[in-house]
From Swiss-Prot:
Tissue occurrence: Highly expressed in inflorescences. Expressed in vascular bundles of root stele within the elongation zones, of elongating upper internodes and of the junctions of leaf blades and sheaths.
Highest taxon, organism lineage: Eukaryota
A Pfam family of this chain: GATA
Name of the protein in its database record: GATA transcription factor 15
Originating organism: Oryza sativa subsp. japonica
Comp. bias regions, Low complexity: 58-74
One GO BP annotation of this record: floral organ development
Length: 279
């Protein structure tokens, strides 16, 4: 409380704070700036009144009624609660009066009941806001036309991320980029091996085609293997001792330089008859 003292000689007033405890002074000062509607001081004197304001996670705003004073009671505490917890505050404030003055802690609803599951929200969003909760990703994909590319995996390595899908043994776009390249290489290698095997098997047919150009080769027996092929340029079969027909042409065909007919004793290398293969 503030007392006014008058000094007759000076002619002015002096306001001196009455001596009291620090707690009373703090409560009086706070009550001056934040008056309550019922005229009481801010720190409640009873347990019931303190329980009514013991809420540090909500904001309470009480509008002034016509019967009360013109100033309203506003609690400017930091709001850390949810709208559901704010709605539960009047129930928690009225609980002490119903229990004969005993303070009852405020019971807030559980988090699972107050909030919505993010998975359910996401599924309902991707399902096109259908109004009914989604029961699973499979039903969501079936109902909203889920893209099959999101569930596609490589048939070889099982990866789901690749810059390009390639054709494979299980159908189009069944392999990832790396596995598709390896599969193509193996396929080409197998095709080349098959072609080589077919050429080796047809060696007897090639020999028969060559034999058509020589009369002596027609009389020779047909040979089916490459190792026993009879040369069509040897007269009398390939048994040895036969006369070689067209030896110059045979040497040119085999890329071999024929030796000179008459070699001298002083020559180390065989002499060429001319610069050309044909004499």
């Amino acid at each position: 409380m503030l007392h006014h003292y008058y000094s007759g000689g000076a002619g002015h007033h002096q306001d001196v704070a009455a001596a009291g405890s620090p707690g009373d002074m703090a409560s009086s000062t706070f009550s001056l700036f934040f008056p309550m509607s019922n005229g009481q001081c801010w720190p409640p004197s009873t347990v019931e009144e303190s329980a009514a304001y013991d809420d540090h996670s909500t904001v309470t705003t009480s509008p002034s009624s016509p019967s009360s004073s013109s100033t309203g009671s506003v609690d400017c505490t930091l709001s850390l609660g949810t709208p559901s917890s704010r709605r539960a505050e009047p129930v928690a404030a009225a609980a002490p009066a119903a229990n004969h003055g005993a303070p009852v802690p405020a019971h807030y609803p559980s988090l699972s009941a107050a909030t919505v599951s993010w998975d359910a929200t996401a599924e309902s969003y991707y399902c096109g806001q259908q109004g009914r909760p989604a029961t699973g990703a499979a039903k969501c994909a079936a109902g909203a036309g889920h893209d099959a590319l999101l569930d596609r995996r490589c048939a070889n390595c099982g990866t789901a991320s690749t810059p390009l899908w390639r054709n494979g043994p299980r159908g189009p776009k069944s392999l990832c980029n790396a596995c598709g390249i390896r599969y193509k290489k193996e396929e080409r290698r197998a095709a080349a091996t098959t072609t080589t095997a077919d050429g080796a098997a047809g060696c007897g047919f090639i020999t028969a085609q060559r034999g058509r150009g020589s009369t002596a080769a027609k009389a020779a027996p047909a040979v089916t293997t490459c190792g026993e092929e009879t040369s069509p340029y040897v007269v009398g079969g390939g048994g040895g001792g036969g006369e070689v027909a067209d030896a110059a042409y045979l040497a040119w065909r085999l890329n071999v330089v024929p030796p000179a007919a008459t070699a001298t004793a002083f020559s180390v290398w065989p002499e060429r008859a001319s610069l050309y293969h044909y004499n």
